Amino acid sequence: MQQRTIKKSVEVVGIGLHKGEPIKLRLEPLSADAGIVFYREDIAMSIPLSPSSVIDTRMATVIGNEKGFISTIEHFLSAVYAYGIDNLRVVVDGNEMPIMDGSSISFCLLLDEAGIKELGSPKKIISVKRAVEVTDGQKFVRLLPSESAKFDFKIKFDHPVIGEQSEIFDFSTSGFIEEIARARTFGFAKDIQYLQSQNLALGATLQNAIGLDDHKILNPEGLRFDNEFAKHKVLDAMGDMMVSGHNILGAYESFAGSHSLNFQLTSKLLSDSKNYELLTVEELESRVFEKSFA
């Protein structure tokens, strides 16, 4: 299996979640071993994707440096993970990614439009060699050795619509598009009102998120899946794992995980070479992972 980029440049315009202003996103091909590189053309700032580029994880995954930042990259990166893309230039003209409909499906469609191109270098993946875990009280995230990429996410909210939910997802590109990509982010009306009073979440609407009051969903169309909330948490986790710069071969498990815990997990995984190996797909003992991108 070879490294991947896109065949041609593509672009789209969407609203930024926090500023509520239009953001232009352009994707450009890159050569083998270039990695995923974000670029803010409004301030001529380049940020190679890696855990060392992460500067904030409180409300979203944010990368940056001394010149500036780019927020809410996780929904886009989940699509990058799902399509097995290794090398890509991601150009935006503001400090956040467009939120689109609050899921990853618009980014999947954009990658479909661009087309996938295989490059003449072997694809490298991170293979988990021993269990790594991060906890915060009852909350946890962990990665375990596995012959395939799996995501098992459980959540519990004191809300009549959400309650306890789970999603177990055996990764494949087609499965992601069918089962995960359309799951939207969600928020509570009282929290959104507070954030907007702080000039945040100014772009949040029922067109790009599931809104909830204390008792019900506010979106007239309802949910896309019975467990859409848990599915979106898997989507987020996939995007956060992609911050490592590579697809990860391992079993991800979580209860009430967050962007912060996910970031701590990838950082802990990569902090000790005994935790993982960086291998070409051909060096893997299992062919299951390669088939998942078919």
Where are these regions (language model features)?
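C-terminal regulatory domains involved in ligand/effector binding and gene-expression control
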Residues: 1-86, 91-294
